Amino acid sequence: MNNILVINGPNLNLLGKREPDMYGNITLENINQKIKLHFKNEDLKIDFFQSNEEGKIIDKIIESQKKYNAIVINPAAYSHYSIAILDAMRSINIPAVEVHLSNIYKREEYRKKSVTAEASLGVISGFGYYGYIMAIEFILNNLVREK
């Protein structure tokens, strides 16, 4: 069985309430359910983790290489400045795909740069919750199934 960890960063626990014009009314729990439902017929275990604390996210990234084939990460605001998360992602020997619900390139200038993307295979941005599904499909089709 393949194991994938989905990591969500700060304020994503507020989805459904926070900036509905930007993110819609979907909650993080709804997103997690949609992801699980989409992959229900796969030989795949998906775990979910969310934290508003940078250190907890770093610890989870470092621990992930013991249990998971890959990670999907939405570092949220940390993507724009967290060298610590970047370094943690570089330190693990499993692939990562970065996801953003909104198109960060259509937002404020300070949101258009993702330092954490440097440690990711790629970035999926602007497709809402479906970006997580796209990331997992990429991982399964290009990294896990070919082994």
From Swiss-Prot:
Identify the keywords attached in UniProt to this record, alphabetized.
Answer: Amino-acid biosynthesis, Aromatic amino acid biosynthesis, Lyase
Q: Where is the active site?
A: 23 (proton acceptor), 100 (proton donor)
Sorted alphabetically, which InterPro entries does this protein's record hold? Answer: DHquinase_II, DHquinase_II_CS, DHquinase_II_sf
Q: Give the reaction(s) catalysed.
A: 3-dehydroquinate = 3-dehydroshikimate + H2O
Pathway field of the UniProt record reads:
Metabolic intermediate biosynthesis; chorismate biosynthesis; chorismate from D-erythrose 4-phosphate and phosphoenolpyruvate: step 3/7
Protein's UniProt keywords contain Lyase: yes
List this protein's GO terms for biological process.
Answer: amino acid biosynthetic process; aromatic amino acid family biosynthetic process; chorismate biosynthetic process; quinate catabolic process
- Which residues are listed under the site Transition state stabilizer? 18
Top-level taxonomic group: Bacteria
Q: Which Pfam families does its entry note? A: DHquinase_II
Q: Which NCBIfam families does the entry link to?
A: aroQ, PRK05395.1-2, PRK05395.1-3, PRK05395.1-4
Q: Which HAMAP family match?
A: AroQ (MF_00169)
Function summary: Catalyzes a trans-dehydration via an enolate intermediate.
Description of how the protein assembles with itself and partners: Homododecamer.
Can you say what this protein is called?
Answer: 3-dehydroquinate dehydratase
Gene name of the record? aroQ
